[in-house]
């Protein structure tokens, strides 16, 4: 190959990448616009936590998964619609559209997201609850979640309180599980992993390290198709549980369940 041929190939590759990103960004803008249309068309902001609104949240999450080239696949029994406090392992901001595609729930998110342009307003209109990490605000949020559960409003949060590479479940923080005990509603564990086309845990989907959100979005827009595998465990009856005993059971079942999910969907299952 001559130098001229090499230069031409590089230019074509750059142009192809530019066109691909342009289409993805265009699809993303369209999806966000559709999300705002749904919020205002159905006036979701007036009753953002009405359980009926979860169908709109699910629709929007599925649109986002299409934009980000994520196929959502449920392993085992699908999620029920009965009220519960939902918990899941946490890998990326992509967890929200992935989980929201498979389950009709409202999400708990860090308070900073409420201030994000566009995304914050859309999340608030979609019934997201916001919590200030590391502050006394968690007591207020726990009470608010308990009140929602008593009204049969499903809420999902990430008890690890941080993201991981998806290989294992970190130590969970169980304070908010007290909402399930107070409301006497079960705990529903959801587990997920992102698998690439080689049958391995995807390395692009995890939002970890020092990368900024905008940088990670650009990486995600360029990534090949990824499958988000979801697994819903049998619900945990909170009757007779203390906060400590419930936290321990949730921790153990999340770790065991994620390992079993890996064994099921990965070509070369992880050790441990």
Question: What feature does the model see in each segment?
Answer:
Residues 7-74, 121-125:
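A transmembrane-helix-recognition feature enriched in membrane-embedded lipid enzymes
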Residues 118-121, 134, 167-249, 261-271:
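A cross-family acyltransferase "interaction/gating" segment
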């Amino acid at each position: 190959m001559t130098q001229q041929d090499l230069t031409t190939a590089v230019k074509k590759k750059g142009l192809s990448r530019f066109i691909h990103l342009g289409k993805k960004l265009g699809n993303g803008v369209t999806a966000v616009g559709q999300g705002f249309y749904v919020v205002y068309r159905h006036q979701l902001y007036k009753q953002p936590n009405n359980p009926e609104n979860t169908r709109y949240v699910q629709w929007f999450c599925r649109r986002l998964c299409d934009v980000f080239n994520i196929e959502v696949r449920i392993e085992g029994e699908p999620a029920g619609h009965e009220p519960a406090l939902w918990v899941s392992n946490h890998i990326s901001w992509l967890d929200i559209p992935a989980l929201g595609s498979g389950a009709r729930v409202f999400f708990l998110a860090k308070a900073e997201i409420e201030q994000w342009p566009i995304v914050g307003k859309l999340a608030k209109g979609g019934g997201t609850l916001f919590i200030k990490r590391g502050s006394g605000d968690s007591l207020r949020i726990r009470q608010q979640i308990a009140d929602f559960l008593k009204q049969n409003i499903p809420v999902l949060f990430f008890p690890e309180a941080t993201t991981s590479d998806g290989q294992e479940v970190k130590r969970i923080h169980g304070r908010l599980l007290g909402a399930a005990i107070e409301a006497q509603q079960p705990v529903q564990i959801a587990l997920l992993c992102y698998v690439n086309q080689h049958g391995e845990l995807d390395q692009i989907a995890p939002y970890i390290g020092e990368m900024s959100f905008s940088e990670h979005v650009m990486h995600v827009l360029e990534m090949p198709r990824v499958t988000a595998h979801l697994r819903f465990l049998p619900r945990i009856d909170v009757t007779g549980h203390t906060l400590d005993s419930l936290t321990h059971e949730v921790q153990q079942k999340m770790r065991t369940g994620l390992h079993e999910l890996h064994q099921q969907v990965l070509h070369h299952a992880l050790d441990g």
